[in-house]
């Protein structure tokens, strides 16, 4: 009976994640269309059937492309992608459903984030396509992903060093911020650095390196068609959703986490894509990102040192 309950919970989690991914994708496209005054073709019945026709065209392209592709590699990539998409949600409470309520939740989230970011770049640039230019652009993008993941790791460790009882548990950190004395994380500097690190980690504007490299070498996203495009889109949107919920829980914890996450998703991730501009990968850009990494290091050392002094004296 217990196994049936676990299977039902897993199915509910997967359905909720897929529905959230679909709604977030439609919301993002709608905001971009409204800002650019480009509503769309509105094909038949006020545009209701337009997403269906677009999906049919994508999968027709996939049927043509998959003829020369090894099916074993495709199945392996799909399994790894599914693990990246759904594993992190089992540690995050959706309503009253919490499958894995253990310590070290932030550590698991960090591992999922690192693997998801690295695999998405590898999946696109190093695995599906044999072009040397796409391979080099994927390596450049992966370099900046490593910098962002290192900064996020230090910020997670800073959160742990500021709390005495969380034990890397996201639920304890979130609930502990209900009390005004524990509302220590919502500093302007910490939120700013954490937000920029999350934008860099999700490869969103102004750090949209995947699109920049696509324009340079014509290949990181533009070669995706059909099923590969759907896989990468679901992986990217799910990564942004987990990032938003983590940002809302760690920096604005307490009550109404879902409402705060929706506001952060719109104003923190959608609108920068609307009003921002892309920063190309240059030497100056690399120095800026390394400076961001050292800012995270200094913040971690400062807060960790003050906690050690407080514990000793």
From Swiss-Prot:
EC number: 7.1.1.2
Main location: mitochondrion
GO-annotated molecular function: NADH dehydrogenase (ubiquinone) activity
Signal peptide: none
Highest taxon, organism lineage: Eukaryota
Annotated InterPro entries: NADH_UbQ_OxRdtase_su1/FPO, NADH_UbQ_OxRdtase_su1_CS
Name of the molecule in the record: NADH-ubiquinone oxidoreductase chain 1
Function comment: Core subunit of the mitochondrial membrane respiratory chain NADH dehydrogenase (Complex I) that is believed to belong to the minimal assembly required for catalysis. Complex I functions in the transfer of electrons from NADH to the respiratory chain. The immediate electron acceptor for the enzyme is believed to be ubiquinone.
Localization in the cell: Mitochondrion inner membrane
Membrane topology according to the record: Multi-pass membrane protein
Regions crossing the membrane: 6-26, 31-51, 62-82, 84-104, 109-129, 142-162, 183-203, 216-235, 250-270, 286-306
The UniProt record lists the keyword Electron transport: yes
Keyword annotations of the record: Electron transport, Membrane, Mitochondrion, Mitochondrion inner membrane, NAD, Respiratory chain, Translocase, Transmembrane, Transmembrane helix, Transport, Ubiquinone
Annotated GO CC locations: mitochondrial inner membrane
Species annotation: Leishmania tarentolae (Sauroleishmania tarentolae)
UniProt family annotation: Belongs to the complex I subunit 1 family.
Catalysis: reaction(s): a ubiquinone + NADH + 5 H(+)(in) = a ubiquinol + NAD(+) + 4 H(+)(out)
Biological process terms in GO annotation: aerobic respiration
């Amino acid at each position: 009976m217990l196994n049936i309950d676990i299977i039902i919970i897993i199915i509910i989690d997967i359905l909720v994640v897929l529905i959230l991914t679909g709604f977030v994708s439609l919301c993002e496209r709608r905001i971009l269309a409204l800002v650019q005054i480009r509503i769309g073709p509105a094909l038949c019945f006020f545009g209701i059937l337009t997403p269906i026709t677009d999906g049919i065209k994508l999968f027709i392209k996939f049927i043509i492309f998959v003829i020369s592709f090894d099916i074993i590699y495709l199945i392996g990539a799909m399994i790894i992608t599914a693990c990246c998409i759904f594993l992190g949600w089992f540690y995050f409470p959706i309503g009253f459903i919490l499958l894995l309520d253990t310590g070290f939740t932030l550590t698991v989230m960090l591992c999922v984030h690192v693997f998801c970011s690295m695999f998405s770049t590898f999946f696109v640039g190093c695995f599906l396509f044999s072009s040397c230019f796409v391979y080099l652009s994927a390596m450049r993008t992966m370099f900046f992903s490593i910098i962002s993941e290192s900064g996020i790791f230090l910020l997670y460790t800073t959160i742990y060093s500021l709390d005495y009882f969380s034990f890397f548990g996201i639920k304890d950190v979130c609930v502990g911020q209900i009390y005004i004395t524990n509302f220590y994380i919502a500093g302007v500097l910490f939120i700013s650095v954490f937000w920029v690190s999350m934008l860099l980690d999700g490869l969103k504007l102004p750090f949209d390196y995947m699109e920049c490299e696509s324009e340079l070498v014509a290949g990181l996203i533009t070669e995706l068609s059909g099923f590969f495009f759907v896989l990468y889109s679901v992986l990217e949107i799910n990564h942004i959703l987990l990032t938003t919920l983590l940002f809302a829980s760690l920096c604005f914890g307490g009550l109404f986490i879902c409402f705060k996450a929706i506001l952060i998703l719109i104003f923190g991730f959608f609108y920068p894509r609307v009003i921002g501009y892309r920063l190309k990968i240059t030497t100056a850009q690399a120095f800026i990102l390394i400076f961001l990494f050292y800012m995270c290091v200094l913040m971690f050392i400062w807060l960790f040192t003050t906690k050690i002094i407080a514990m000793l004296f």
